[in-house]
């Protein structure tokens, strides 16, 4: 931020004034607007009070019930005012430093689930904590809370006869839905009338407010379904939707399984730079950042491939990395500019070995985490058609050129001629004939990739390997040992989407330089995604890279398939979103 921008922000902050009700710093205009609104609400409330005074007396509502009838902005203002007062009086302190939890909710449930109806253990004292998602009262001497924590829920039964040290009414006066509370009490099972089973509960001796929720939570009946809010306010999504928590628990378990798989096979996990002077290792458009001290532009990494191969040159024969990649490309249902990948490199392995490893890893992972090799998937969302993805071995294998020749009923140029101008004209005509669009630059590589996407990838529902790629599409892959012009590479597809890319690594420095030069020519033709020569990597190859297999997989897409999510935003805790329209007047919470 420039000095001029900083000064502008400073002046804007100086112009703010304190809202005595909410404790926020706001502009004078905003404060006047709020004061007028409060005056109108006060007059309205006065009229309603006068009207109510002449009406028949009805049963009183609890404070929390009355507040639930307010609109969210009124609720926030009232709740903020109450908590501001408690911060001053400390009676009670709404933000205590510590509450000693003696047992988690999962542990409590596992330990006391066997209690019989009406059985209690008043001699056992426990302390639990959680967020209140349900609250109901039965008179002045009985309250029930439903608290959630660690993916579990528990009923809190509060009876005036059990209260100790602190007055019963005082304990519960300021507790609302959404608050995080601590409960000290004893385990038991309720004994409700007219029900065969009671509910496992903690019978509270004391309830303590640990952190108030100032915002009104969505109503229990409707929940939180708005996608925009769920993705922008993931914390609220996690509070309200158990399925969201389960999805990210599954994501964590998937990564744990992958890490254990490679650790148990003597691979070493490593970390490589995320900012580089050259964007290499993949065909993609990079993000550019600037290093102020060195006064130079750097690229956010698009793949860790080149660094990992340098480590194999250095004698680390089995390495892998799980980390973030950054690609300055479009965002859609399966793409996010920032995403997680796993790459591994294994000396003395080729792409045939890697296909076996891929099947072993993913078939085993699916079986271990879901209990079956088959998982349901709805590519268009829960209301759309249902696919069954079968990860059992062996997987189908499709030879790219042979399959296209069969599908399109035409003969392709030989593999070693697919990079020529004649091949380019052939591919252009083929795309035009079949209505396949390819945006400029229409290189041979891009044209062929569009045909593959239209006629092969669209048929890959169950896990499928596509093999037989031309060298021009794979600047870092080794040439095929028996098919001229092709290379030893495969891509694995599931539900029509690529999840893995692997090949026998190119370790011939002379061939590698020639490939880089071809990529440079493509970049000169306007292909922003083409790679440029990385002299540091070439120097490493001059020391000798052993025969090596290299493999990469997108973690996010795999999580999508195993959690039945049809958009990548559902499996990213904080997905990339366009900025919201900002309010005209800035607000700053006063310390």
Curated annotation (Swiss-Prot):
GO terms for cellular component: cytoplasm. One of its GO terms (molecular function) is ATP binding. One of its GO terms (biological process) is lysyl-tRNA aminoacylation. Residues 24-79 are annotated as: Disordered. Disulfide bonds: none annotated. Its EC number is 6.1.1.6. Residues 27-50 have a biased composition (Basic and acidic residues). Residues 51-62 have a biased composition (Low complexity). Gene3D superfamilies: Bira Bifunctional Protein, Domain 2 (3.30.930.10), Nucleic acid-binding proteins (2.40.50.140). PROSITE patterns: AA_TRNA_LIGASE_II. It comes from the Eukaryota. Keywords: Aminoacyl-tRNA synthetase, ATP-binding, Cytoplasm, Ligase, Nucleotide-binding, Protein biosynthesis. It catalyses: tRNA(Lys) + L-lysine + ATP = L-lysyl-tRNA(Lys) + AMP + diphosphate. Signal peptide: none annotated. InterPro entries: Aa-tRNA-synt_II, aa-tRNA-synth_II, aa-tRNA-synth_II/BPL/LPL, Lys-tRNA-ligase_II, Lys-tRNA-ligase_II_bac/euk, Lys-tRNA-ligase_II_N, Lys-tRNA-synth_II_C, NA-bd_OB-fold. SUPFAM superfamilies: Class II aaRS and biotin synthetases, Nucleic acid-binding proteins. Transmembrane segments: none annotated. It is found in: Cytoplasm. Its main location: cytoplasm. Belongs to the class-II aminoacyl-tRNA synthetase family. HAMAP family: Lys_tRNA_synth_class2 (MF_00252). Homodimer. This is Lysine--tRNA ligase, cytoplasmic. The lineage of its organism: Eukaryota, Fungi, Dikarya, Ascomycota, Taphrinomycotina. The gene is krs1.
